[in-house]
Amino acid sequence: MPKREAAANPARSIPTTAVFGLALALTAVPALAAERIATQKVEIEVTEIVGGLEHPWSVEALPDGAYLVTERPGRLRVVRDGTASAPVEGLPKLFVGGQGGLLDIALSPDFATSRKLYFTASVPGEGGQGTALFAARLSNDETKLEAVERLFAMNRFTGTGQHFGSRIAIGADGTLFFGIGDRGEMDRAQDPQDHAGSILHLNPDGTPAADSPFAGGSKGQPEIFSTGHRNPQGIVIDPADGTLFTVEHGARGGDEVNMPKAGSNYGWPMISYGKHYSGADIGIGSSAEGYEQPVHYWDPSIAPGAIDVYRGAMFPEWDGDFLVAALKYELLARIERDESGAITGEERLLEGAYGRLRDVKVAPDGAILLVTDEVDGQLLRISRAAAP
């Protein structure tokens, strides 16, 4: 239901109503009713799975068709048959404030047998708060987390309440990628001895992955995979070829899709396609030697909260396209790519209809899951509309 009250020449998105807008007025409908919407290539239906969530941040589909949903204020719920459970017990002590709280959740590849999952959160500690990664086991009765273990925490906690990152992507080898923002102190993103403003790569036990560009730690923290990131809140591995992509918030303009590679520097705050909120220039321009270019950027910003690559069966027309959940314009961006992976266009869906879109995930059946970052947030499902 609608909301309640790295290329040499990166692709750029600018608002074009004729191309991106949907000439469709969405009106309130009863809960669980489907809203039918025409897009450029296919008709879709949007259905509310459950409402009444408080600032949901992440969703994962369970093997039996239920869902796990995190709420930023510090709750994890199981959604089954259109009903959200009582909060799952066993979460560690969190820092909840500003942009911090319970953040992403990801199932271990062997979850069906092990019940293991990972989650990120902001936690309190010496000096303030910072981002941490945890592993746990969901109990068989789905009421509590067991064997909760903190695998990793960033090495410098501060009192700021923003730019914690942080989503998780799991590689075919079981290793974990996740991002941490600059924590609102932009120069930290250029310090390889500081975990802030970086993409990290860890083994399932929290130790640095074998491909660490800073192995040994003498030139940088060994968990760091790439640097120069402002606030990466989306991360995904393309299941077709294993390519890693991130999406991150710019300032006033300059949101980016990046393709991180080990040891590379993505420029923040030395280069950016945006400006400071004051209107002042950032760094030394939009490009400079030694810094990687994004594969795509937005000006003005859309405030991207998550990214996935569509590889499902339900929408073959969208195969290989990026799906980006956006907060600022309350939209789902479909970034069209050709067979070579080059970006060829963008379609903006659901703009202003459901609220701030925080997460997007392709479900096992090819449907698309969204959560809305609102006080009265929703878990939504996009499916292919039946033939009229």
Segments the model singles out, each with a brief description of its role:
Residues 132-141, 193-204, 260:
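Beta-propeller blade signature
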Residues 178-196, 254-256, 260:
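Short, conserved, GDST-rich strand-edge loop motifs in beta-rich repeat architectures
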